[in-house]
Amino acid sequence: KFLLAIAVLSSLYSSSQSTLKMDFETYNPPSTLVVPGKPVLKAKYPFIDVHNHQFGMPTMDLGTLITDMDKMNMKVMVNLSGESGETLKKSMANVKANYPNRFIVFANIDFKNVGESGWGEKAAAQLEEDVKNGANGLKIYKSLGFSVKDINGKRVTVDDPRLDDIWKKAGELKIPVLIHTADPKPFWQPMDANNERWLELATRPGR
């Protein structure tokens, strides 16, 4: 009987312990830190959203977007994803035809073929053309310095001199340049139990 009682208790303990186990990715408790008040859904004063990504702007119904902007009192949206060439021209045509005073569009650089003869001059010329077509700035994505490689397979750094023509042209055009760079150090370390960003890297591998 004594041994049976021990076996039963051991079984109950093991069962209770198993119910306490949970995958780290599953653990997401609601916060108990609750403050009085209600969510602010509309800004008191008109504001400018300086960081937005609207990839479908060439063909999207801007009226729907404007409705959402008006609900929160957003006066102007800066779309950092204007791309380049014909795509940017179509975005600007859509904006000018419908809401010319509500959007600012930034161009982007196509970093394919870095290292080819004359690549920098061509990229700078395309940027100038994009500005003529309505772009108000240049947005550089985190891929530069992270995944962009030249024609020889070598990673292209942000301070690569082959990009100097682009920065020079941006200065001549007097347009702002926004660069997303310097990812956290753990992004470059082994993805194991010692990486403090493991959960982020596991659940969002494309970051």
Question: Where would I find each of the regions flagged by the language model?
Answer:
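Active-site gating/metal-coordination segments in enzymes
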Residues: 18-19, 38, 88-207
